[in-house]
């Protein structure tokens, strides 16, 4: 038997691709003529940068370049120098079900790099990094509705259900000329650390306005002859408006922003003898917009007239969403393996990982922070110390949530003090932006098969008196005896269908052959 039903559904994100591939980086580097010979290598770093991402014809194509940065001590002045070389990479992934408006998420993670010196001016390096790729699309999940005809008894559960109304992504560039101001002139850049943070979002119909800030930290050479170094910490605010179909003032927005690639060059300034920094970043902003509404989900159903067989499914419901921002202080002591430290030149972090777990207390974010210390030993020779520090942080006000859509950690600041001539005490401030969600799995009815050829046999008596057992409810009694739930509630003055009625006598009348539910 088929009935007319109201089609109800909610929308969620679904990953049509979620994979990772290893990319190799092989570099044969010869120093330019203006660079002095290498006496000691301090640090080799892989910096993957993604330039383009395209999805066409069932293939996701990702192209970019990997910068290999070498920090070393020169053989003449025993000062810190830097050289780098870039190699291109390309990777394609097969996407079986390519969506019409996909959202592409990518990230890279350096794995290792090995360096071998063939001469004081030539290095051969072999490294690898992981390229993570995910493609998101939207998918509808149907919610079963009982037929309009009054022939089924349905057990309903009222829930909060978040439905995806917008899923959009936009790439954009931020170009800025940065002046060092009253700081020493920049002659050569040694290392760069860039992070991005979304500070505020506002939605109007069809548009999302995002405000954020870019934090640029530089270590550079101020005088090539003396080898003196300087540091720059620059905060650049930005704003961007992107088109988002389905977004409005009532949408709960989960927004993330990633740095795909960046380029920093020195540029002569006609107004000053100090060169400017030309900063060119390519950012990618991703938005998931949700609207939370009340829904009545059918968790069980039966007919008072015919035999029935309900089919069940698991509904994955998001009942609440929130953007959580928090900070964490991680303290650690780093000891030098050999020798002593006379001076700390710079402390930075070039990598931070994050994962999350959930329990009754809330969402805990944990991972590792890579700490890089550039210092001088007792002989005034530069040394490099690298450590991975574990951290774990319970997000504030997260006890109501059991899932995270996005976890974005960043190292906001690092301070230190020399505890003694071989130990550095570090204080690292980590800031988190977490898009938290409360997820539920509900066993719900997906369809009900009604067997008209198997009618319910009428009871021979006019009244049944039933003594409820422990754990029974009016619903379970009504279903097992094929009687109308509303009538059972009315006759027994029960407050609700799930009220505990253990050891209570329950009575109900039966339909005669010529009666209908409306006659009772």
Q: Predicted segment positions?
A:
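C-terminal beta-sandwich interaction modules and adjacent acidic
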Residues: 1-470, 475-493
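Short acidic, glycine/serine/threonine-rich helix-capping segments at coil-helix boundaries
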Residues: 494-505
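Conserved small/polar residues in nucleotide/adenosyl-binding loops
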Residues: 509-516
């Amino acid at each position: 038997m088929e009935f007319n039903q109201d089609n109800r559904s909610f929308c969620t994100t679904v990953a049509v691709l979620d994979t990772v591939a290893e990319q190799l980086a092989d570099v044969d580097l010869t120093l330019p003529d203006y660079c002095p010979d290498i006496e000691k290598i301090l640090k080799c770093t892989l910096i993957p940068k993604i330039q383009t991402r395209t999805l066409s014809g069932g293939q996701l194509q990702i192209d970019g370049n990997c910068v290999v940065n070498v920090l070393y001590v020169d053989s003449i002045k025993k000062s810190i120098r830097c050289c780098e070389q870039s190699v291109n990479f390309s990777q394609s992934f097969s996407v079986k079900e390519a969506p019409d408006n996909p959202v592409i998420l990518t990230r890279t993670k350096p794995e290792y790099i090995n360096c071998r010196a063939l001469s004081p001016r030539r290095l051969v390096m072999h490294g690898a990094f992981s390229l993570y790729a995910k493609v998101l699309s939207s998918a509808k999940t149907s919610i079963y509705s009982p037929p309009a005809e009054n022939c089924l008894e349905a057990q309903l559960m009222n829930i909060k259900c978040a439905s995806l109304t917008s899923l959009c992504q936009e790439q954009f560039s931020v170009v800025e000329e940065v002046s060092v101001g009253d700081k020493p002139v920049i002659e050569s850049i040694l290392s760069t650390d860039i992070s991005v943070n979304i500070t505020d979002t506002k939605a109007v119909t069809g548009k999302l306005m995002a405000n954020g800030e870019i934090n640029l930290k530089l270590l550079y050479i101020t005088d090539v002859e003396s080898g003196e170094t300087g540091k720059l910490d620059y905060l650049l605010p930005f704003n961007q408006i992107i088109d988002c179909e389905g977004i409005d003032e009532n949408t709960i927005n989960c927004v993330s922003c990633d740095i795909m690639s960046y380029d920093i060059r020195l540029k002569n300034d006609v107004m000053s003898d100090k060169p400017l920094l030309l900063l060119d970043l390519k950012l990618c902003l991703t938005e998931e917009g949700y609207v939370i509404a009340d829904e009545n989900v059918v968790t069980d159903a039966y007919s008072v007239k015919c035999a029935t067989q309900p089919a069940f499914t698991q509904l994955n419901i998001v009942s609440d969403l929130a953007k959580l921002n928090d900070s964490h202080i991680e303290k650690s002591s780093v000891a030098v393996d050999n020798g002593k430290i006379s001076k700390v030149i710079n402390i930075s972090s070039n990598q931070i990982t994050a994962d999350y777990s959930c329990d009754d207390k809330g969402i805990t974010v944990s991972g590792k922070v890579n700490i890089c210390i550039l210092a001088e030993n007792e002989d005034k020779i530069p040394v490099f110390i690298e450590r991975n520090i574990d951290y774990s942080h319970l997000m504030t006000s997260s006890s109501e949530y059991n899932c995270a859509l996005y976890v974005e950690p960043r190292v906001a600041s690092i301070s230190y003090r020399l505890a003694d001539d071989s130990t550095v005490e570090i204080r690292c401030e980590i800031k988190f932006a977490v898009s938290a969600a409360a997820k539920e799995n509900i066993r719900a009815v997906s369809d009900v098969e009604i067997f008209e050829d198997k009618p319910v046999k009428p009871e021979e008596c006019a009244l049944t008196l039933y003594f409820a057992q422990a754990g029974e409810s009016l619903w379970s009694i009504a279903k097992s005896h094929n009687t109308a739930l509303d009538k059972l509630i009315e006759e027994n003055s029960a407050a609700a269908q799930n009220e505990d009625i253990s050891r209570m006598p329950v009575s109900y009348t039966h339909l005669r052959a010529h009666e209908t539910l409306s006659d009772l």
